[in-house]
Amino acid sequence: MFRITLAIWLSSIAATACAADITVFAAASLKESLDENVKTFAAKSGRQVRVSYAASNALARQIENGAPADLFLSADEAWMDYVAQRNLLAQGTRRNLVVNTLVLVAPADSTLSLRIAPNFPLAAALKGGRLALANPDTVPIGKYAKAALTSLGVWSEVEKTLTRSENVRASLVLVARGETPLGIVYATDAKAEHKVKVLDSFAASLHPPVVYPGAVVAGRLNPATQALIDYLGGPEARAIWIKYGFGIAR
């Protein structure tokens, strides 16, 4: 009888521990910073956190299709709006966490020098190569970059050269490997990859603000998920975001 009771008790503990796990769907560009943040949160709270990284558009559609995400961290407000409009966010949990900057990058050993300005010779600088950029129709970094290049008057010249990568990290890899001469990524991505160098930054006025909102998914609000979204907007997390090059959303 004691063994049966003990087995039931241990099974209950295991089930509780499993139930306490938190699954986060997060924009690919958050990887290093969020990895450190969830590690810190887990150490303090005892909660285990799993993170799935991908393009925000892909994650939003997975949530729409019933994927078991507890939190969603998007690289733009539009895809968070997409989820919210389908009543898939827990009310009162959405908040803007961090902001980012767009940069033009080249392989670290490139001799190319190029400054961003109206009508700057981006297409000519590619010399027949391709511009590493995530899909501008769906992926946040691609949409921001399209807006910036349109503002600068060079979008029509480079549109056909795009790699249309699935996310910003895929674009970063192409540049780091020297498979493309240039790419557009977030400043935080460039900081995380020593095999690329930043040629110049895009002025924030050229595109919509690069804001990363976070929220708990509908039906997933509990003390653990509330604690995590609160932590990610709190002072300890802010210090980690800043360490990796993000700005704090106001």
List each language-model region with its residue ranges:
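Exported/periplasmic ABC-transporter solute-binding proteins
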Residues: 19-67, 74-77, 81-100, 105-250
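Intrinsically disordered, low-complexity segments
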Residues: 9-10, 203
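N-terminal signal peptide c-region/cleavage motif recognized by signal peptidases
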Residues: 13-19
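Bacterial N-terminal signal peptides that target proteins for export
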Residues: 1-9
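Alpha-helical transmembrane segments and their juxtamembrane interfaces
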Residues: 10-13, 80
